[in-house]
Amino acid sequence: MANPIRKLVDNSKQQLKKLNKIADQVESYADTMASMSDSELQAKTGEFKSKIADAIDGIEDKDKQNKALAKVLDELLPEAFAVAREGAKRVLGLYPFHVQIMGSIVLHGGNLAEMRTGEGKTLTATMAVYLNALSGRGVHVVTVNDYLSARDAEQMGQLYNWLGLTVGVNVGDAPAEEKRAAYNADITYSTNFNIGFDYLRDNMVRRADERVMQRGLNFALIDEADSILIDTARTPLIISGPGSGVSQLYARADRFVKTLQRDEDFKVDEEAKATLLTPEGIHKGEIFFNLNNLYDADDTALTHHIDQALRANFNYIKDKDYVVQDGEVKLIDQSTGRISEGTRLSDGLHQAIEAKENVEIQEENKSMAQITYQNLFRMYKKLSGMTGTAKTEEEELREIYNMEVISIPTNRPVRRVDKPDLLYTSIRAKYNAVVKLIVELHEKGQPILIGTGSVEDSELLSKILMTKNLPHNVLNAKNNAKEAEIIANAGQRGAITVATNMAGRGTDIKLGPGVAELGGLVVIATERHESRRIDNQLRGRAGRQGDEGFSQFFLSLEDDLMIRFGAERVRLMMQRMNLDEDTVITNRFITRSVESAQKRVEGNNYDTRKNVLQYDDVVREQRELIYHERDVVIDESESLEWVLMPMVERTINRVVDAQTKEKKSSDWNLPQIVAFVGNALAHDDAVTVQQLQGLTRDEIKAKLLELAKLNYKEKQSQLYDPEQMLEFEKVVILRAVDQHWTDHIDSLDRLRQGVGLRGYGQLNPLIEYQSEAFANFQKMIADVEYDTTRTFMKAEIRQNLRS
């Protein structure tokens, strides 16, 4: 039987062999490029653009054009990469290594390059970005925050500008004109957050010139790709409008749950991050709210608020899951340790936390537009990414994004030592051991980076270090303004830096003078994260570019991960060994248990992301249809009669069919058809019951359609200017579409939140959602067409029509 591991290794070797061969071709141009003058090298950009234009000239079919473009870019790759490489040497003083060329080839191929920390991912990207920007279709370089977008655009932009390409930076709060200019550049630096919301907002505009993204989604190159494509994928992007005010039930539910006793009145499920009332708790609820049955069908709103209050109070922890700043509850991104500005929990959970923290409860918003990052990035013609850690999520990246993860060798051998985990029975004993090691290392002058699992833990460790008179910096979600400065200095002699997960990404930690001789940077972690990737990122801060260093993880049986998954087996083993609190355990069983727990969490998180995607895939088909129809209307330059009149005809057919269901024509509801004509199609006395009697169903439809056509011609004559007529048609159609689409999105949001309960009735929630979402969409289309018909046909024409 074939060994699957051997097959994977062989495939990996084949991939690297192929990459090496192409990288050799790139390097073969080195002397030629070096001999060119600046102007000769810069002229290559125009030469490449001409070759691309010639390759796709005269090809009308879009798919064939895209294939021709891909072919010519592949042919140009060795020479174009060599141009960008030589340009980097002259402009930036940096010359990409062989392994960086390999990484950039992976990026051009639409895959994910896994490159260790300090291997120069930003420089690696330049060659693939340059080549793909030559097409003039736009390249989006996606980063995790505005700071990195601005930094990389400024640094690498010098190279692109020198080579004759334009560079734009899309900052979140920039005005529309600046965003438009940024997106129209050859290369655009932006965060995933900004691109997602700009895409949604562009599909809510009423005029073509209001869009900021004037071109399609061509090529995205994502930095820290695992963070963006995986960690943020559980939270959909939602544009909201004002809702129906704040319910008083949030405060009442919060007061109630604060009277309850743990284990007696409720049970906390740490693994599922849920809290459930016991029978005693339910009884107390019935007394508190003066009800006979807390779970009566008439009181579902109350029970929903109680459920959210329970989660807010007992599953969401202050300074771990969120912070309170300036009277607001702000979420902490668990993968980065940073505050997720502008992100709110849905389904009333955020309001429940606000009630818990006694800050102003903000009203629930109505969803108007939404998309998941999975579906956003799958719309790009080509998607690639780079990160230090992705192999653990290889299956998900392949299945969701059709990307292969290819590990690029390091330029120099890795000398960092990753020591075995140390396990203690209690948090107190663990911190004692951590501080003891910090003191020992600090006496030598060796720099130390200590990674903690939460803001709360970083502040606790900081207090302990203060009592020991150990000078240190703290970096967490509360003080991330100095992030770059703190991290940049973390490799200096004697530096002690306490940080949350945010220390694992972004700015490199470079060793100060004399630090290499001391053994390099030491990374200490006070617990294992849910994800092995986050642990590996933290480890990767030490030993960059062949530097020395080591990493050490300290764990306790009281850590969140151990409590939620698998601590019991380890605890029993330690009890059998009869160990005291301060005794440390280190063996392969512990490491395997922890990694097993992490795999379970990663599996759960993958299931959550897949679930979010499955539900969004239902909406995706509807969203693409609506957005396409909006684009057709907005981009029309002559007349929308060909769009509007079929909508009118379908509305007529629906109304007539609904009122003529009976076999006998004498039983047809002709007065209702006459009422429809007066309400939505023509003037009140345009048709009578007598005129419809004796006609067949099809003849009635034809008569009503003829009335509609006459009405349309009348509107045309009143609006003698075709431009005004077109503007009128656009306003009518877009208003109807937008009103009903936003209502539909909000109703789907509520449907998704409620459909899970049907699982208790042995029904598949996803299938139920698909079925109802489709039925609701069909009804929405009918409502849009009816409102368009009524508004257009019954409108009194006035001049200066504007949306």
From Swiss-Prot:
Its Enzyme Commission number(s) read 7.4.2.8
User: What are the recorded Gene Ontology BP terms?
Assistant: intracellular protein transmembrane transport; protein import; protein targeting; protein transport by the Sec complex
Record's bilayer topology term: Peripheral membrane protein
The coiled-coil regions, if any, are: none
Q: Where does ATP bind?
A: 100, 118-122, 508
Where is it located? Cell membrane; Cytoplasm
Question: Which regions span the lipid bilayer?
Answer: none
Which keywords fit this entry according to its UniProt record?
A: ATP-binding, Cell membrane, Cytoplasm, Membrane, Nucleotide-binding, Protein transport, Translocase, Translocation, Transport
Gene3D superfamilies given in the database record: Helical scaffold and wing domains of SecA, P-loop containing nucleotide triphosphate hydrolases, SecA, preprotein cross-linking domain
What SMART domains has UniProt attached to this entry?
Answer: SecA_DEAD, SecA_PP_bind
Q: What class of enzyme is it?
A: translocase
Cite the GO molecular-function annotations of the record: ATP binding; protein-exporting ATPase activity
Q: Which reaction does it catalyse?
A: ATP + H2O + cellular proteinSide 1 = ADP + phosphate + cellular proteinSide 2
Tell me yes or no: is Zinc among this UniProt entry's keywords.
no
Main location, first listed in the record: membrane
Would you name any one GO CC term? cell envelope Sec protein transport complex
Q: Family, per the entry?
A: Belongs to the SecA family.
What is this protein for, i.e. what is its function? Answer: Part of the Sec protein translocase complex. Interacts with the SecYEG preprotein conducting channel. Has a central role in coupling the hydrolysis of ATP to the transfer of proteins into and across the cell membrane, serving as an ATP-driven molecular motor driving the stepwise translocation of polypeptide chains across the membrane.
**Quaternary state and interactors:** Monomer and homodimer. Part of the essential Sec protein translocation apparatus which comprises SecA, SecYEG and auxiliary proteins SecDF. Other proteins may also be involved.
Q: What is this protein called?
A: Protein translocase subunit SecA
Species whose genome carries this gene: Leuconostoc mesenteroides subsp. mesenteroides (strain ATCC 8293 / DSM 20343 / BCRC 11652 / CCM 1803 / JCM 6124 / NCDO 523 / NBRC 100496 / NCIMB 8023 / NCTC 12954 / NRRL B-1118 / 37Y)
